[in-house]
């Protein structure tokens, strides 16, 4: 039984879990936040040392009604070091939670801001 326990322990060490990246995430819409059109969001991400994340970092923007699971998620594409653009489309008006998730290797950080979406 001990060899099995040792193997399971080693396997657990090999499977890397995500850890907090402590990234600084700033984002804002660059157009009117409204329904049925793609709304561009500028996203800026720096690591804990203040260095911009590379353009190939995995940055996602998700939209959800507050307290609910995301309705849609879009990939933000890199336009420069630490600079990304995402264009979600809001299906209805009202208050929406916009969450940006930035990932680099096994580091991940999320930030959520609520926006009022016009019709």
Can you name each region flagged by the protein language model?
Residues 1-5:
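Positively charged n-region of N-terminal signal peptides that target proteins for export
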Residues 17-119:
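Contiguous segments within soluble domain cores/interaction surfaces
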